Amino acid sequence: MKINLYYWNNGVGVVNHSKLIKTLLYEYDVISYDISIKNEYRKSDLGIFIQNILPDELSNNKKNIYIVCEEWLTDFEMSHIDWFDYIFVHSNHAKNLLSLYHKNVINTGFFSLDRYFFPTNTKELLHLKGKSIQKNTELVWNYKKDTNILDSSHKYLSENELIHELNRHDIHICCSLYESWGHYLWEAMSCGKLVICSEIPVFKEYLNPELVKFVPIKNIYDFVINYEFLNTKNYKFRKGYFVDNFKFNELLNNKENLFEFQKRNSDNIRQHFLDVNKTNKQKFLETIKFIL
């Protein structure tokens, strides 16, 4: 069976997602196409589009799947959503949103890279912004004396450097305004590290509240002019989940308790990552087999 995998090389999560999917589908004849450059596309049994679409290429494939992160769906993409046979999403929250627009929306979950590599305990905190505009870095700047902030817009991290930072820091702050999943959070957990995260829908679905530190949501906004992620009306499903600053401050004022929690629960945190990753990989594979 031939599968064409289409993705836009954004230099971050989408690229990793495409690699993960191609590796998982090793039993099939898979070709990956970076649609940010010109390509000659073959005909296939199944086309899988990750976030970005090429409407003119759908006819090359007998069936087509669209994998979406709902917060990045544009009006253009929404206008073509019914051209696809199936829509894959990462959570029941997203399924409920998009089932109003398509009859075959399937929650396949998500899976991330296992970054475990001889983790150490340094009693340090990290906020890995990467290139993202939705990690709520504005919140963490107020605590930069206590937290290392890595911004890929200013300093590029190699793959080895990224793995080193994930394994070196005991606590990772990921109070995202919104995520349809969240590679950073899961990759940190793969190293047995404690994550402080916002109580947004997808995190609540998949995370064990006994193994992470949730920060309650105080307000939800569609538009906030001072936040790049929310300073637009171009994305129908985009919302910003703002955490309770007081509760966040309370957590950071008890860092020693957090470090002890991480050390005590490290193995269980990693096992939770492994369990969810395995379950969602199986679900994805079984769904592909059903469709083909």
Located regions from the model:
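Short hydrophobic beta-strand element within catalytic cores of glycosyltransferases
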Residues: 194-197, 204
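Acidic anion/phosphate-binding donor-loop and adjacent secondary structure
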Residues: 76-78, 99-100, 110-124
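N-terminal pre-catalytic "stem/leader" segment of glycosyltransferase-like enzymes
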Residues: 1-53, 232-233, 278-282
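Aromatic "clamp/platform" in nucleotide-sugar-dependent glycosyltransferases that forms part
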Residues: 177
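Conserved catalytic-core segment of nucleotide-activated headgroup transferases in glycan assembly
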Residues: 114-159
